[in-house]
């Protein structure tokens, strides 16, 4: 009898502890929705609440701590620590924790997890009916059995309302588009998101009339994606109204569509730039920052970068360099090339992360990063590296790349001197509007460096340099 009583008391105690742990976890989620912690004390308070909840075996808290360790959010970035928290939550049958372990293993983020272990965790998450895990698993099955993958995705939407699964069915070119569209038509009769997707499908086929019809139905029922597609349709219509399109983006954002929040913010920043009064400028910019903050917290990487810029330069908000750099770091960690480049420029040249960030941005096609990498390679006397980056930039028609190559071949930096090629490169740079090249070509044609002397051509380039306020050219009479 007493044993039964003790067991009942233990169950009640465990239930109370679990309820308290859940309350701590929910409090953290509410704080996160309000924005990034402003001070170290606020950040530590959020971490402490999660740790307390995790210690009481509340799996979602353990999983969130693991995610923060992966991102370096309030905690030191540490994959081993993240794995420990994920494993703790996985033992408590938390589907998301299994999925996070699968991600780490499949992406080779840690030697602690083999591919086989990653797949096992993915299957565990699928068995726990985690919608995102089913989505990932279905994508893995595409090569082996596309029909089975399609059915998994379709069922994942019909049973779990996993919107990305249905969206993938529309976007993946390997599925029969007619079959997918017929399925959408059936679902759309009673489903506003399917209606929105059908509109998007028609939009990608340039059938604006059909896209308008279904997007209008979806937006009338306040479907966020439907409002977004309705905005896209309005932008593409022959007599589309930009103001109306912005209203649909704002409506989509209000209903939780993150991409719309970002796009609406971009439009507002443009409006702020062109505003005729300071009051309107502040009004547009402030609303833009609110939308960017919402999208950034939700993980939208371009929004994180844009928010960083607003905070760094005090646009629509008080200037806050620390927060700005923090958002810049988050965007850079998620491979945003502009963020990687700007973060590298903020770091001293000797900093261990300066060159890797610069290199990563250049690899993604960031033209300024390419030029900086070429200069770095020149300083290292690495002709092959310097030429590689300049030629990559030249392929993208970057004027400065032609100019720097012209300098290299004129001065014999890392390459043999070739005055004729140098003159041709300066000419190409000038054709692309490079002001310094106008002045270089003036000297080239004046003195006959790699070309025949030509006073008329020299005078033409000197005039172009002067028209573009080239300092040295301004004082020359020719």
Positions of predicted regions on the chain:
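TPR/TPR-like (Sel1-like) alpha-helical repeat modules
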Residues: 154-159, 453-470
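Residue-level detector of the short coil/turn that links helix A to helix B
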Residues: 73, 77, 113, 144-145, ...
